[in-house]
Each structure stands twice: as C-alpha cells, then as structure tokens.
C-alpha cells in the first residue's frame, strides 16, 4: 500500500460509513465497497488495513449479516465508533425547497425523515444508498429531485444543502465495528475495554439463563445481546454479545469460564478500547 493507510467501508463515497471512517481515522484513504462481504475481503486480501462495519443503529436496530460474516473472515474487531446520523436535504446548485417534488434516499433514511416529506409534500423514491441517491440527483441535474444524505455527500457531489438536520429524531446514531487482520495491541487489562464474542446454546429451558448467570455474579455489564438461528435450524441458537471488560481481567474472566461451561461454543471476535462516546450522558 506504499505507506498509504486505507480503511474500507460499505457504500458509495459520502455515505455515513465513509464519514465514520474519516472521523475515526483522520488522514486515511477511504475505500468504498459494494457489500459488507467485499469490505471484509478488502482487508483480508490486503487492499485495506481496516474495515468500518456498521453493526447497529439506535433507531433501526441491528445491521444483519455481520455476525455471520466476521467469524468466517479471519478478522478481529479492534475498535468501535459511534457516528451521529445527520440527514441533509440536498439539491443541485441553484435549486430551492420550493422546487423539490421528489425525494430520493435509502429506505431506512426515508423512514427517518417523514416530517420533511409531509411538510414539503414530496413523493418518496427509494434508492439503494444515501450517497448513491446524491450521485443520482447530481447526474440528473433536475431541481425537482432532491436527496437525503450526509453533508459529506453534498461536498463530494457538488450539491447544495437545502436544509440540515431533516431527521425526525435527534438521537440517531450508528455504531460501527472496526476490523483488522490482526488483534488490537492493548495495554495490560484494566478498565475501559469492550469484548465482543459469539456463543451457542441449545434450545432448552433455562439454557440462556444459565449461560449468562456468570455475568451477573461477576458484576459484568452486557451492552448488547442478539440472537440468531443457525442455518435455518430451530434446535440451536447463536448469540452475539458485547460486554464491558477485558477477558483476562478477573471479573470477565470468571464470567466467561461459567459461560463456556453452559454453552456449546464460544468465540471471541475482538477485545478493544471502549469508545469515549459511551461516557456521554
């Protein structure tokens, strides 16, 4: 990579994942990829050093497929980033809000800007990507078509921001995993760490309760727990879990020992510094 540091993301240039890359790793070159699988592959084959992978959103919930892709990729989670989602209404230069007739954006973003759609009486048109919608509005060159995307997408596509912060909720935040081919180099175990792991239990009464009992006993805080059926089977369930702590520190180490006793399989996907965002009120 000739000294150039590259971080890959899923989406078009100007996507919120692109913005997350630029804020989390200032000065790095961002590499857009079409899918999450291609984003992971870019790191795996050496085209990028890191991958920025959206994992959950405060309004839309979990991002699918990440739990299935990461274990098979041979990557490690080495960090996390929280990105505030601030939707902007974008139009071609010289256009105004009064010109707008059709609004283009990703379906999740469309559901988050119902207020502006109603206020302006716009016809919603669903597109594959927020930044992709901005590119299309630029290419069409019509004042009647506007896009909902980031301020970065406006900058990269030469569009005007007709109105900022058109999102209905101000607490719209996306959390990202930052993944690498190598595990994070960390200081000795102590406070301020997060651990992400997968584990599997049988669908039997009390199985999950027993598996997680050690967390409560050890005083370990669990911040995320997602369940997934395995390969279409109803006989076993896989869980993706984020917990506070380092697996070599006594509280979490004890909890993981108990978890391994009651679970069929356990795999740590990464140990990494907790984001400063977690300390915000």
From Swiss-Prot:
InterPro entries associated with the record: ACT-like_dom_sf, ACT_dom, Chor_mutase/pphenate_deHydtase, Preph_deHydtase
Pfam families per record: PDT (PF00800)
Record remark on domains: Consists of three domains: the N-terminal and middle domains form the functional unit, which is homologous to the catalytic PBP domain of the prephenate dehydratase, whereas the C-terminal domain is homologous to the regulatory ACT domain.
SUPFAM superfamilies registered for this protein in UniProt: ACT-like (SSF55021), Periplasmic binding protein-like II (SSF53850)
Subunit organization: Homodimer.
Disulphide bridges, residue numbers: none
GO CC terms of this entry: cytoplasm
Keyword Lyase included in the entry's annotation: yes
EC number of the protein: 3.5.1.97, 4.2.1.51
Effect of residue 25 to S: Affects dimerization. Loss of N-acyl-homoserine lactone acylase activity
Keywords: Amino-acid biosynthesis, Aromatic amino acid biosynthesis, Hydrolase, Lyase, Multifunctional enzyme, Phenylalanine biosynthesis, Quorum sensing
Domain Prephenate dehydratase: 6-181
Residues that hold L-phenylalanine according to the record: 207-208, 221-222
GO molecular function, one term: prephenate dehydratase activity
UniProt pathway: Amino-acid biosynthesis; L-phenylalanine biosynthesis; phenylpyruvate from prephenate: step 1/1
Signal peptide: none
Function: Multifunctional enzyme that acts on N-acyl-homoserine lactones (AHLs), beta-lactam antibiotics and shows prephenate dehydratase activity. Acts as an acylase on AHL and hydrolyzes the amide bond of the acyl side-chain of AHL molecules, releasing homoserine lactone (HSL) and the fatty acid. Can use different 3-oxo-acyl homoserine lactones, such as 3-oxo-decanoyl homoserine lactone, which is the preferred substrate, 3-oxo-octanoyl homoserine lactone, 3-oxo-hexanoyl homoserine lactone and 3-oxo-dodecanoyl homoserine lactone.
GO terms for biological process, alphabetical: L-phenylalanine biosynthetic process; quorum sensing
Reaction(s) catalysed (UniProt annotation): an N-acyl-L-homoserine lactone + H2O = L-homoserine lactone + a carboxylate; prephenate + H(+) = 3-phenylpyruvate + CO2 + H2O
Positions bearing the site annotation: Essential for prephenate dehydratase activity: 174
Segments forming domain ACT: 196-273
Record-given protein name: Bifunctional N-acyl-homoserine lactone acylase/prephenate dehydratase
């Amino acid at each position: 990579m000739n000294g150039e540091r590259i971080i890959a993301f899923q989406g078009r240039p100007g996507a919120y994942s692109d913005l997350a890359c630029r804020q989390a790793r200032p000065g790095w070159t961002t590499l857009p990829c079409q899918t999450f699988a291609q984003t992971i592959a870019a790191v795996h084959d050496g085209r990028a050093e890191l991958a920025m992978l959206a994992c959950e959103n405060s309004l839309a919930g979990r991002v699918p497929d990440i739990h299935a892709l990461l274990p098979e990729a041979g990557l490690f989670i080495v960090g996390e980033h929280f990105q505030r989602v601030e939707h902007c209404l974008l139009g071609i230069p010289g256009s105004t809000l009064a010109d707008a007739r059709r609004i283009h954006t990703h379906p999740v973003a469309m559901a988050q800007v119902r207020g502006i759609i109603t206020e302006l009486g716009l016809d919603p048109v669903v597109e594959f990507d927020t930044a992709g919608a901005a590119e299309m509005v630029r290419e069409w060159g019509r004042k009647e078509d506007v896009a909902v995307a980031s301020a970065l997408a406006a900058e990269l596509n030469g569009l005007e921001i007709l109105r900022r912060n058109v999102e209905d909720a101000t607490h719209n935040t996306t959390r990202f995993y930052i993944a690498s081919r190598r595990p994070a180099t960390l200081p000795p175990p102590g406070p301020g760490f997060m651990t992400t792991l997968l584990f599997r239990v049988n669908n039997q009464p009390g199985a999950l309760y027993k598996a997680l009992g050690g967390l409560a006993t050890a005083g370990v805080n669990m911040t995320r727990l997602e369940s997934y059926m395995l390969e279409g089977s109803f006989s076993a369930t896989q869980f993706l879990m984020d917990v506070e702590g380092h697996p070599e520190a006594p509280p979490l180490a004890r909890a993981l020992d108990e978890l391994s006793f009651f679970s069929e399989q356990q795999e740590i996907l990464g140990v990494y510094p907790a984001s400063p965002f977690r300390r915000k009120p």
